[in-house]
Amino acid sequence: MIDETLLEAEEKMERAIEHAKEEFGAIRTGRANAAMFSKIIIDYYGSPTPLPQMASIGVPEPRMVIIKPYDNSQTNAMEKAIRDSDLGVNPNNEGNQLRILLPQMTEERRREMIKVARHKGEEAKVAVRNIRRKAKEELDRLVKAGEVGEDEGRRAEKELDDLTQRFVGVVDELIKHKEAELLEV
């Protein structure tokens, strides 16, 4: 029972970390990367579709992105969605593809992105702590019901705390790495 609860908590925490990594990948840094466009949604014949499912995204140079739509009739919709996004970029529509030159990030924009990264990191930490809280409630329920002894319950709680600390540490590392990436000129 205890092992199952701890294993389930660990799996959920790992999923929270994966989600945080995706969120951090979507934050724009000074360099171009395809993940920047993963959160852009385009209305594709009435259904909201993520940009990466509608086009191939290439990064031929550190500050250039080429987006080649699978359906050329959607090029204008993609251009508008990218322009309206919070990325702060202006795509050049070349008919069959979009060329995006990323401007050099200003110091102010870098600081703004660091705040966004810290906020996303805090959200990930809260998610990990919520998972811990739910697992602890389950452990307390098991002890109260008499399914496991109090000593075993305390040992499991300590394991859960260690697990939580480990995953919060991973989030801290992700934040530190993203800040360094953003401050790199």
UniProtKB/Swiss-Prot annotation:
The keyword Nucleus does not apply. Keywords: Cytoplasm, Protein biosynthesis. One of its GO terms (molecular function) is ribosomal large subunit binding. InterPro entries: Ribosome_recyc_fac (IPR002661), Ribosome_recyc_fac_dom (IPR023584), RRF_sf (IPR036191). Pfam families: RRF. Coiled coil: none annotated. It is found in: Cytoplasm. GO terms for cellular component: cytoplasm. The keyword Cytoplasm applies. One of its GO terms (biological process) is translational termination. Belongs to the RRF family. Responsible for the release of ribosomes from messenger RNA at the termination of protein biosynthesis. May increase the efficiency of translation by recycling ribosomes from one round of translation to another. This is Ribosome-recycling factor. It comes from Salinispora arenicola (strain CNS-205).
